[in-house]
Amino acid sequence: MAAGLATWLPFARAAAVGWLPLAQQPLPPAPGVKASRGDEVLVVNVSGRRFETWKNTLDRYPDTLLGSSEKEFFYDADSGEYFFDRDPDMFRHVLNFYRTGRLHCPRQECIQAFDEELAFYGLVPELVGDCCLEEYRDRKKENAERLAEDEEAEQAGDGPALPAGSSLRQRLWRAFENPHTSTAALVFYYVTGFFIAVSVIANVVETIPCRGSARRSSREQPCGERFPQAFFCMDTACVLIFTGEYLLRLFAAPSRCRFLRSVMSLIDVVAILPYYIGLLVPKNDDVSGAFVTLRVFRVFRIFKFSRHSQGLRILGYTLKSCASELGFLLFSLTMAIIIFATVMFYAEKGTNKTNFTSIPAAFWYTIVTMTTLGYGDMVPSTIAGKIFGSICSLSGVLVIALPVPVIVSNFSRIYHQNQRADKRRAQQKVRLARIRLAKSGTTNAFLQYKQNGGLEDSGSGEEQALCVRNRSAFEQQHHHLLHCLEKTTCHEFTDELTFSEALGAVSPGGRTSRSTSVSSQPVGPGSLLSSCCPRRAKRRAIRLANSTASVSRGSMQELDMLAGLRRSHAPQSRSSLNAKPHDSLDLNCDSRDFVAAIISIPTPPANTPDESQPSSPGGGGRAGSTLRNSSLGTPCLFPETVKISSL
């Protein structure tokens, strides 16, 4: 026992001595003391998803929204949380930035939405980490290019319809840039395409050797020299068409300076200029070489097909977007050509009858070898020349193959962007067509029901209900809206303009009104306004309550969509559905088939000097009203016509 105690006692003493420095230090504070330092937990509620973090974590970046006192504007005292109506998935990356100091860009999120979230929280895009910075910039550049191309396509392509008062230049430019807008533009589009093809084919055919007849010499001559008159007439017709097109485009261009600097304008000038120079320059031996050189430029007419081919335009956009990669390829090839041409010249310099007479002469061999063509007109004969020729061939394959995937990816990207843009435009056209069709269909059905007596009154007194027969929910709601409009405006629905006509509607009196006000009522003997207040007949502008436009009393107003007409009572009219003589009107029906819509008429302010009492909708002297529609027979027109608007 004593031996065992003597064994472990030195170790115990050593351990006690080791603990002495720690025992002299004060004990750590209790857990409750830590909360008094001011480091508290903040709860951030982002669209219902709660995030918790330390206050000191957010205070690291005081120039941002969460790190500054501006976040107190979003504090909810009832729940004790900071509420932000933003994207919670995006906020996760924002909060990680406060924790780690590195901002990461999510791949699955839209880059534009990510930028909007950064702008809201006061973070700059330069804070994106190095791991995501390159991809972030590429995606942002691609998105900017796509938006710019879509905007340009909308401006030059199937944009919105031109207003009714558009100028001749605007209509011409729209016809040139979008031939499918009208039949005449489409015909001109195909005519110019036909003459472009004729010009290119004639330029090729005139160089084919043609044999003469048996009686004449059998010496072959080009077809252009044997039949000069025919080719001159074809060339003249084509150039006249191209000249007329160019002048019309120049006249209709929104910016003529920009049009003159465009690539297609230069192509048009190069295509037609040789013809006019050939007419002015005399044909003699001194200028024959220059004349032949000018005729070569006629081949550039083939680039006019780029206006008629979407694939050629995509190829042009691809080459434009790959300018940096193509520049790198050209620079690399130039360096390799100079190096290998120099090596091949000195390797073949000592041989007899060598074709490598100089370094520029060796350029041809190097270019043909690096592009893997290998014509065989120049070949090395020494062992060193063959070795360096093999290295030149392999290096050419590597240098040329490197930029190809980048060009292919850009072409695929631009092609799919154009496909998506075309699809969006087609979907927009279909959507607008469906809206017009549904609107026109329900309107015509409403008029037909009125003509056939399909709409009847049921009930009496304040229990007015509109009975319908075999109609869809959309039709029922639309008909109910028109019915309520009739009751509140004291006029029957007669006709509805089309969608495009309604957008371009112009008031006959030069005035517009944004609400169905009392100024839209007819003024005359026996009308509602004249019977209640004769001063309304004066043409004096007033400001109505709940109205943003100043209207004129006693003037005929054209507001938006509908037209009303007062005339005598007819057997099939629904005069009982309009305003009643008493003041209590049931504006909505109690049927379950409809969505109630309350439509109120703004009334003049009570402090108007010349109006003591508002007019009653059921004033005396109001004649019965009937239906007027062009499809229902010849209507009887009366001079008191007023147009009312749909809501």
From Swiss-Prot:
Phosphoserine modified-residue sites: 458, 555
Gene: KCND1
GO cellular component: dendritic spine; neuronal cell body; plasma membrane; postsynaptic membrane; voltage-gated potassium channel complex
Species: Homo sapiens (Human)
Reaction equations catalysed: K(+)(in) = K(+)(out)
Transmembrane segments: 184-205, 231-252, 264-284, 288-308, 324-345, 387-415
Main location: membrane
Sorted UniProt keywords: Cell membrane, Glycoprotein, Ion channel, Ion transport, Membrane, Metal-binding, Phosphoprotein, Potassium, Potassium channel, Potassium transport, Transmembrane, Transmembrane helix, Transport, Voltage-gated channel, Zinc
Entry domain remark: The transmembrane segment S4 functions as a voltage-sensor and is characterized by a series of positively charged amino acids at every third position. Channel opening and closing is effected by a conformation change that affects the position and orientation of the voltage-sensor paddle formed by S3 and S4 within the membrane. A transmembrane electric field that is positive inside would push the positively charged S4 segment outwards, thereby opening the pore, while a field that is negative inside would pull the S4 segment inwards and close the pore.
Intramembrane segment ranges: 360-371, 372-379
Residues annotated as glycosylated: 352, 355
GO molecular function: A-type (transient outward) potassium channel activity; metal ion binding
Residue ranges, annotated region (Interaction with KCNIP1, KCNIP2, and other family members): 2-20
Binding positions for Zn(2+) per the UniProt entry: 104, 131-132
Recorded family membership: Belongs to the potassium channel family. D (Shal) (TC 1.A.1.2) subfamily. Kv4.1/KCND1 sub-subfamily.
Protein name: A-type voltage-gated potassium channel KCND1
Residue span of motif Selectivity filter: 372-377
Compartment list: Cell membrane
Known function: A-type voltage-gated potassium channel that mediates transmembrane potassium transport in excitable membranes in the brain. Mediates A-type current I(SA) in suprachiasmatic nucleus (SCN) neurons. Exhibits a low-threshold A-type current with a hyperpolarized steady-state inactivation midpoint and the recovery process was steeply voltage-dependent, with recovery being markedly faster at more negative potentials. May regulates repetitive firing rates in the suprachiasmatic nucleus (SCN) neurons and circadian rhythms in neuronal excitability and behavior.
Its membrane topology: Multi-pass membrane protein
Ranges facing Cytoplasmic side: 1-183, 253-263, 309-323, 416-647
